[in-house]
């Protein structure tokens, strides 16, 4: 064999195994880096989306109904009604005129009757024999009864069922109503600040300002809902009998 065309190969001219693997490993490493970058980008997008969602949820204002349900036991009104809040400046100085205050007249008595009379409610969810009413109307009934009791010597309330009972029961009814109003006030615990105003005409030099900002539930809507769900028939007539309008008592001639 002619060996003239051959020449010796030096050791450094022979590629090592690692050098033979280098192109393949380089491609694999490049692919891995691309996947790593993609994973990091997706992870960043996911974290940003999660933080944005938490921010939106954390700053979203709950509805009036949602808030009310946190502060009240079950009520059919909170399931069916539209709880609307009203913000206004209340006029309530010491001698503020009102259709509900002052010496009893047929007009004042009628105004009070309209506040609470048609409150009976039947819930068809539990069958036709489930009867009840919203507590606000019981509270108004109690306040009205205490008001009438303070004027019982000046006005003829003989047609009011509560006053036809024995005096012990009448007194018990009044005390029950006072307790009901006390508990209601303490339960609500209105924390609206009442500020003082300078008033040189007063000995103390100041007076309380009861004309304050208020945020209240829309009572008209609550009343409309109660009337729309009121029981009709004899029951309503029997309930209404306890608030029959009276007439001013005639003073005895001497």
Swiss-Prot record:
The chain crosses the membrane at residues 38-58. It is found in: Membrane. One of its GO terms (biological process) is mycotoxin biosynthetic process. One of its GO terms (molecular function) is oxidoreductase activity. Pfam families: UstYa. A motif (HXXHC 2) lies at residues 173-177. It is a single-pass membrane protein. It is an enzyme of class 1 (oxidoreductase). Its EC number is 1.-.-.-. A motif (HXXHC 1) lies at residues 138-142. Pathway: Mycotoxin biosynthesis. GO terms for cellular component: membrane. Keywords: Glycoprotein, Membrane, Oxidoreductase, Transmembrane, Transmembrane helix, Virulence. It comes from the Eukaryota. Glycans are attached at residues 64, 159. Its main location: membrane. UstYa family oxidase; part of the gene cluster that mediates the biosynthesis of the phomopsins, a group of hexapeptide mycotoxins which infects lupins and causes lupinosis disease in livestock. Within the pathway, phomYc' catalyzes the desaturation of the Ile moiety into 2,3-dehydroisoleucine (dIle). The pathway starts with the processing of the precursor phomA' by several endopeptidases including kexin proteases as well as the cluster-specific S41 family peptidase phomP1 and the oligopeptidase phomG' to produce 10 identical copies of the hexapeptide Tyr-Val-Ile-Pro-Ile-Asp. Belongs to the ustYa family. PANTHER family: CYCLOCHLOROTINE BIOSYNTHESIS PROTEIN O, YALI0B05434P. The 2 HXXHC motifs are conserved in ustYa family proteins and might form active sites. This is UstYa family oxidase phomYc'. It comes from Diaporthe leptostromiformis.
